[in-house]
Amino acid sequence: MSVLFDAKAFLKTVTSQPGVYRMYDAGGTVIYVGKAKDLKKRLSSYFRSNLASRKTEALVAQIQQIDVTVTHTETEALLLEHNYIKLYQPRYNVLLRDDKSYPFIFLSGDTHPRLAMHRGAKHAKGEYFGPFPNGYAVRETLALLQKVFPIRQCENSVYRNRSRPCLQYQIGRCLGPCVEGLVSEDEYAQQVEYVRLFLSGKDDQVLTQLIARMEKASQNLEFEEAARIRDQIQAVRRVTEKQFVSNTGDDLDVIGVAFDAGMACVHVLFIRQGKVLGSRSYFPKVPNGTELGEVVETFVGQFYLQGSQMRTLPGEILLDFNLSDKTLLADSLSELAGRRINVQTKPRGDRARYLKLARTNAATALISKLSQQSTITQRLTALASVLKLPAVKRMECFDISHTMGEQTVASCVVFDANGPLRAEYRRYNITGITPGDDYAAMNQVLRRRYGKAIEESKIPDVILIDGGKGQLGQAKAVFAELDVPWDKNHPLLLGVAKGADRKAGLETLFFEPEGEGFSLPPDSPALHVIQHIRDESHDHAISGHRKKRAKVKNTSTLETIEGVGPKRRQMLLKYMGGLQGLRNASVEEIAKVPGISQGLAEKIFYSLKH
């Protein structure tokens, strides 16, 4: 317990009502957020002579101040607690490292509805199906739907400006509602209804309707139509055979957990209308000494309550752990959803199978994660030995990418004790240098990165410079001139030159820009971590450069046309679905874009053609 914090005096002022408390250290940083049904009773438990765990002892030793917020109900306290955790990210709380919204399949409410992937707030008119665990699962489902039910997936800006059908129509992946006469309104509406039923888990209804239509077409001697419907029936059956489907039409999330060596994996199985849409593993940040019950309780609260704006709540949640606050959680989620949400911990039948599946996946993912962490730890230990350092807790690596000197981009990649720290990867657009001058580019990015105040925890132990002696010389010169409040002599600067024929395993390392370098054996773990971070940096630089080059390519042609400014350029690209759509458009189609006159449309048309 902190000597400066008077616990007895503080506890005399605390109420016995429900609420939330925030604990601060000497630097004024929030180090823990908690909730309580009885604030006085809960906070008193921190200042007993025999504390429950080492984690609590370490926490209490740093307390300098405690702020209390009283709430009317336990539900309000629970919601506020998770909002504070998300805001402050306290180091003694279990933290869910997941800020991405989940994707849905969106069926629009247009006259001719379209299918698309959607993330974020649901403002657009239409129906949303999901959530799916990731974008890949949505794209895979959309590709499958396009083969079975050929309704459009194009943007409205493209759809409204077509005079002839696109390639998707030619290969049978779209019915072509953009062009009058290609498909009847009834047929298109029928296919949309099939999609709606299919995504709602009502595959049997789809098959029943298709079989009835096939038999009717056959009776009317419309054999080509009957054959087309037969093929569609076979396609639907092939799809449903591959899916793990429950007969009960469940709408639930299943949460399994595994905990070992201070690391936790929580695996969530998403089931909607009886279909497993996919699953996802999470590795929350767990402070030392945290018990499994706290991990599960905090994860579930953060997973649903922090992401409430983006996450669709199922009717039921199956848990692999019996929570002490299960009723409170269910009540809070029900209040949030405006309907009853059940939280179940001892399911039977199919639900028990689901839970076993989630538990198995959590254990498998945790074993894999621990194995990866063991490997990166071994490699960093080997690197520290080679470089004669006590430890390598943080590394940063730089690379430069450009095309013939144009659109130069520098990348900075960060590794910590757990490997790639992608949240801290950065790209820098390099300007004001002679095109193709990689030395000047490296000089600029290092000054921008290190010529400012840096938190002590973010000072790297090793800075890897991809490029060999010359680039290392630039780095040494930059650091010699730095005037910063942190210890600029702490990072070890290490140059890496590619081997002969740029083959992996033949790299040469340099401590100084003059003299001979040294090489490591191809099977050296230290070399493997150097190759890993260098390849990450190279890929990060190239992907950034490609994005920048594509952006310039898509806009520079239009910028040269007199009368086309930023707003008109944006309008043209939006209505034509991109530069390629604009290149393929006629003068009449271009003139339909708001703000584009007939004369300007002709000028744009001929400029793009020539």
From Swiss-Prot:
InterPro entries: GIY-YIG_endonuc (IPR000305), GIY-YIG_endonuc_sf (IPR035901), GIY-YIG_UvrC_Cho (IPR047296), Hlx-hairpin-Hlx_DNA-bd_motif (IPR003583), RuvA_2-like (IPR010994), UVR_dom (IPR001943), UVR_dom_sf (IPR036876), UvrABC_protein_C (IPR050066)
Any one GO CC term of the record: excinuclease repair complex
GO molecular function (one): excinuclease ABC activity
Entry keyword Protein biosynthesis: no
Membrane as UniProt keyword: no
Positions of the UVR domain: 204-239
Protein name: UvrABC system protein C
Organism: Citrobacter koseri (strain ATCC BAA-895 / CDC 4225-83 / SGSC4696)
Gene symbol of the encoding locus: uvrC
